[in-house]
């Protein structure tokens, strides 16, 4: 299993900032040159076309441009690999029907990180709140060591990044052997009552098959602050000192919004994997959910992919099954009898014309997610439907949990 730990870094305390910035710029030029050669050189000559082939050209680069000899060789190979990873992601999006262009040339502002892989780094002095990260060709960088890296984790990669706010961060890519992880309960001995289906929606952030719902995180104050700061930025001359100071203010507001969303997602996902043996979620087409104009503003707030990834890696850490199921028809299909009924987005209640079953539309969808996932895990289906076995819930009297409560308490409880 692979996951990340992130720490604040302070290269300025050891005079390493200038060298780190120069090295990142060299990596940026390496990325852009990889892109250039991929477009210009014939892939049939076996010089380019794969990360391995292209990495073999680095010796020629170093002979022609001495700056490439300044940076660590493994880190330079990782930069070439990053281009091909981005290329692969682009191809995957195209295969899935998304409209994609070509990988863009990276400007200095767009490329602000570098990654050491396998070697060229060492974490030292980890006994206190401040540790030291040594990077080959750069030197020592103090980091705010606010949590210990687990003893059973192996550091495979180290990424040094300068944020748009001017702050530096270090991310450790950690690997834990699967044998070190807690065992997930076997499907044939799991109790369906210890499983939950969740619907990721627009009206509520999540709605569980147990009848719990969590409101969207309220970012209205942050959006208003961002609007004011961006308006102030637009009045300043681009590139001036005042413009740069205001740009950092805008970046800090965005960073605060991002952290607030991530904190909410972390606490909600942790609560789910601790409470249940299995969490079932729709494999949503996020762009489809949020493509309408009325929902466009929620795109950066939702970050559904990030939330589902949190569930997946925390499921491994806590021994919880995370299963994604086909979302087709979960809202239309009646959880009681299976008859499908079309509903526009503004209709928030499910009322089946066939059997008369009524529920909140998101609650009905979560029942269907639960039912499909139980079948996928091979648990079979009880004589009763999820709608019949679930705790009786009157949607008109069920209070949705504010996102602020999740942040404050780390749970859906009071």
What does each model-identified segment do?
Residues 88-100, 177-184, 317-323, 342:
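Active-site phosphate-binding and catalytic loops of NTP-dependent enzymes
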Residues 298, 302-414:
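Positively charged, low-complexity nucleic-acid-binding target-recognition regions
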Residues 35-65, 164-308, 378-414:
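Substrate-contacting helices/loops that form the catalytic groove of nucleic-acid
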Residues 34, 79-90, 363-373:
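Stable alpha-helical structural segments in soluble proteins, enriched in small hydrophobic residues
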Residues 52-163:
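Acidic carboxylate diad motif detector
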Residues 128-136, 168-174, 350-351:
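Generic recognition of long tandem-repeat/solenoid scaffolds
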Residues 1-76:
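Gly/serine-rich nucleotide phosphate-binding loop at the start of the catalytic core
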């Amino acid at each position: 299993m692979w996951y990340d730990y992130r720490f604040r870094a302070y290269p300025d305390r050891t005079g390493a900032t200038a060298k780190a910035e120069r090295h990142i710029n060299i990596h940026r030029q390496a990325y852009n040159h990889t892109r250039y050669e991929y477009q210009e050189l014939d892939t049939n000559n076996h010089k380019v076309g794969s990360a391995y082939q292209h990495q073999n050209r680095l010796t020629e680069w170093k002979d022609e441009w001495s700056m490439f000899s300044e940076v660590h060789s493994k880190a330079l190979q990782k930069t070439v690999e990053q281009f091909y990873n981005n290329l692969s992601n682009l191809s995957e999006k195209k295969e899935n029907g998304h409209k994609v262009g070509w990988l863009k040339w990276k400007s200095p502002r767009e490329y602000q990180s570098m990654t050491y892989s396998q070697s060229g780094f060492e974490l030292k002095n980890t006994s206190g709140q401040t540790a030291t990260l040594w990077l080959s060709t750069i030197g020592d960088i103090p980091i705010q060591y606010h949590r210990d890296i687990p003893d059973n984790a192996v550091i495979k990669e180290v990424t040094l990044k300068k944020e748009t706010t001017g702050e530096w961060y270090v991310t450790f890519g950690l690997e834990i052997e699967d044998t070190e992880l807690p065992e997930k309960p076997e499907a044939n001995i799991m109790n369906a009552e210890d499983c939950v289906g969740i619907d990721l929606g627009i009206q509520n952030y999540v709605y569980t098959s147990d009848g719990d719902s969590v409101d969207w995180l309220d970012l209205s104050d942050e959006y208003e602050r961002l609007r004011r700061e961006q308006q102030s930025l637009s009045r300043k001359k681009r590139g001036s000192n005042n413009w740069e100071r205001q740009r950092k203010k805008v970046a800090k507001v965005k960073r605060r919004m991002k952290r607030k969303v991530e904190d909410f997602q972390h606490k909600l996902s942790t609560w789910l994997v601790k409470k249940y043996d299995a969490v079932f979620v729709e494999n949503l087409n996020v762009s489809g959910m949020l493509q309408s104009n009325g929902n466009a503003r929620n795109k950066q707030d939702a970050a559904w992919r990030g939330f589902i990834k949190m569930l997946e890696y925390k499921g491994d850490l806590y021994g919880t099954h995370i299963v994604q199921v086909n979302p087709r028809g979960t809202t239309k299909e009646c959880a009681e009898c299976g008859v499908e009924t079309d509903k526009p987005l503004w209709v928030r209640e499910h009322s089946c014309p066939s059997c008369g079953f009524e529920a909140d539309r998101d609650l009905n969808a979560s029942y269907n997610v639960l039912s499909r996932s139980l079948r996928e895990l091979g648990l079979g289906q009880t004589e009763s439907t999820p709608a019949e076995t679930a705790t009786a819930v009157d949607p008109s009297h069920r209070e949705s949990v504010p996102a602020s409560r999740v942040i404050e308490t780390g749970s859906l409880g009071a």
